[in-house]
Amino acid sequence: VEKPKNKSNFCIKPFNSAWIDATGEINACCFLDPLQSEYTEKKQYNIKETDIKTWWGSDYMKYLRSNFLKDKRPTECSECWKREDTGLISYRMRSNTEHRAIFKSKYQRNLKLIGKDDLQFPDDLQMNITNLCNLKCQMCSGEHSSKLLVENNALGYEDLNQKDFDLKDSDYVKILELLKHDLKILKILGGEPLFNPRVIKLLEMLVENGQAKKIKLHITTNGTICDDKIISLLKNFKDLRLVFSVDGVGKCNEYMRFPSRWEVISANITKFKENLVNAYIMVNCAVQNLNVLYLDELLEFTNQKKIFVKFELVIHPNWLHLSVLPKNVLSMAYEKLSSVKEKDLLHTDNVKEIIELLKQHIDNYNLDENKYKNFIDMINKRDTYRKIKLENYMPKLARAIAT
């Protein structure tokens, strides 16, 4: 069995991973949409109606794996193909790099069992346990933030019911029990995981039953919560990755991730870093039209802290896309990022990707007036609802779009 070529369309996720969201939907990853599949009997599996074993051994999953082994591009994976076709690094590419070590072990074993019912269970599980969150970030949705759900419903942007995001504790306990012998990586996302008593309870269970010593735990957090109990629990895991969702420094992040306080987040990052020797700590920044003028400040902060920062381009919602900005703002952002000193790029790997994308938008500039109007309307409506003003948080951006 040969290892897939680096430049192929192969993705490791259907061979080793499961993703479960707060509504109970289960897929190989968070970007995959099975309803967009060309498979004749496509369906969305849900742990409220089935179990992870049935989904993992389903004919659909065998079909998906088979497509990747034939070097095809499954239509349900369009989000990754879109990114790659525009020169961006996709989740597929990152996942293949992250799991390269298992290509010769679990990948080969599961390859031999394609079409059979005894595929080894996933060893990488990502769970969005609930949408319970203490912030309402600009790029988020009600599916991932209970606070933003309330705001979006009030503004008429969504029609979701909070009860749809309340899975039973027993559902997750059942899943972890089923994966007890295979699970190596557990990724917990939000809402805000550390704001959620259910997550703390889950971590306690993993520590008490001894699984924590065998698990690499990944938690994505907004950095607003840190206490001694959480630190004590996290110390028990074999390996730990804490990813802080930060979109700027100071007032910029407070606007992007409202109603956070920067001094609290900065202090918590330091506290986690100093008290968790088993942790790899990094920052994930959602690059969008609201914060692109301030990325150089974030680079300076992460460099001072000696923390790696990864930049992820926001595609949805489309009113936050970089292409919606006036040309003068794109040019300002390009000049600022291009002038960042090499010493401030020691702890990142994809700034040049963002710089190149800005240049492409400038060189092929074609502003959609309707999208720009929607961008301004969204800012004004959210600011009015939150009783804040953009110019008090990000004056450079406010002045730039005003001119």
Task: List the predicted regions and their residue ranges.
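Conserved C-terminal portion of the radical SAM core fold
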Residues: S17-T23, D239-V243, E263-A402
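Core AdoMet radical
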Residues: P122-L132, E143-S170, H181-N196, N209-D227, ...
